[in-house]
Amino acid sequence: MPMAQMTQNPVFVAIDTTVVGDATTLAARLHDEVGGIKLGLEFFARNGHKGVKEVCRAGALPLFLDLKFHDIPNTVAGAVRAVMPLAPALLNVHACGGRAMMIAAREAAQSEALALGIAPPKMIAVTVLTSMDDDDLGGTGVAGGVLDQVRRLAALTRDAGLDGVVCSAREARVLRADLGDDFLLVTPGVRPLWSTTNDQKRVVTPQEAMAEGADVLVIGRPITGATDPAQAARLIAGEIVGWDVGI
């Protein structure tokens, strides 16, 4: 699967704080326990490039820059070029922005990475937010339910030449069958059995997510909200691979 080319640990920890000091502390503590870090829109809006660079220096881990770009193609291409100096390993857009927008994002990432002499990011698209269920989606005017929409948008993403999608692990098995082993599946909404579900409705455990075909697991509060984040990350690793992590 594509994940093996990035890191042996499939867990990217979602550092969902706007405080740079807290984020850098978490990144440093988790350096040996996770495969990467995810920074999102709220952190980026508050702290910009400087804050992202500080966290990346502290953690020395691959970066998933979760900004979910969604605008006209030229604007998205410009936004992608603007964040490329941060050298993200993963960068995402909204699939519902359409094929032309996704192509523009991919081409901008590739050309700017070449100009900067860095590896281009894996470009992925958001299908349906994991906070949404069938009723929520129907309220936006989309018929057919979450899975139908996820499959449509994932196919569109592949046709635009992107590397994969963000999806719930509950859709991963179907998407793996639809789109093959070389299509990256990044799954938020993953919670170990000992954690609460918080605000995400389509939730599975880490072990279940991997069994369903996920490549990257995005896990936030079960790790970052724990008394000992490093221990929590090790417990999750133990759930995934079924080994005794010595805790």
UniProtKB/Swiss-Prot annotation:
- Positions that bind substrate: 16, 38, 66-75, 130, 191, 200, 220-221
Enzyme nomenclature, EC number: 4.1.1.23
Query: Main EC class of this protein?
Result: lyase
UniProt keywords (A-Z) are: Decarboxylase, Lyase, Pyrimidine biosynthesis
The terms under GO molecular function for this entry are: orotidine-5'-phosphate decarboxylase activity
- Pfam families, from UniProt? OMPdecase (PF00215)
Q: Which SUPFAM superfamilies match?
A: Ribulose-phoshate binding barrel
Q: Which residues form the signal peptide?
A: none
Q: Which reaction does it catalyse?
A: orotidine 5'-phosphate + H(+) = UMP + CO2
Cellular compartments per GO CC: cytosol
Q: In which pathway does it act?
A: Pyrimidine metabolism; UMP biosynthesis via de novo pathway; UMP from orotate: step 2/2
Superkingdom, natural source: Bacteria
Q: So where's the catalytic machinery, residue-wise?
A: 68
Per the record, the GO terms for biological process are: 'de novo' pyrimidine nucleobase biosynthetic process; 'de novo' UMP biosynthetic process
HAMAP family for the chain:
OMPdecase_type1_B (MF_01200_B)
Assembly and partners are described as: Homodimer.
What is this protein's function?
Catalyzes the decarboxylation of orotidine 5'-monophosphate (OMP) to uridine 5'-monophosphate (UMP).
Check the record and name the NCBIfam families matching this protein. Answer: PRK00230.1 (NF001273), pyrF (TIGR01740)
Q: Which family does it belong to?
A: Belongs to the OMP decarboxylase family. Type 1 subfamily.
Question: Under which name does UniProt file this protein?
Answer: Orotidine 5'-phosphate decarboxylase
Organism, as annotated = Rhodospirillum rubrum (strain ATCC 11170 / ATH 1.1.1 / DSM 467 / LMG 4362 / NCIMB 8255 / S1)
User: Organism classification, top ranks?
Assistant: Bacteria, Pseudomonadati, Pseudomonadota, Alphaproteobacteria, Rhodospirillales
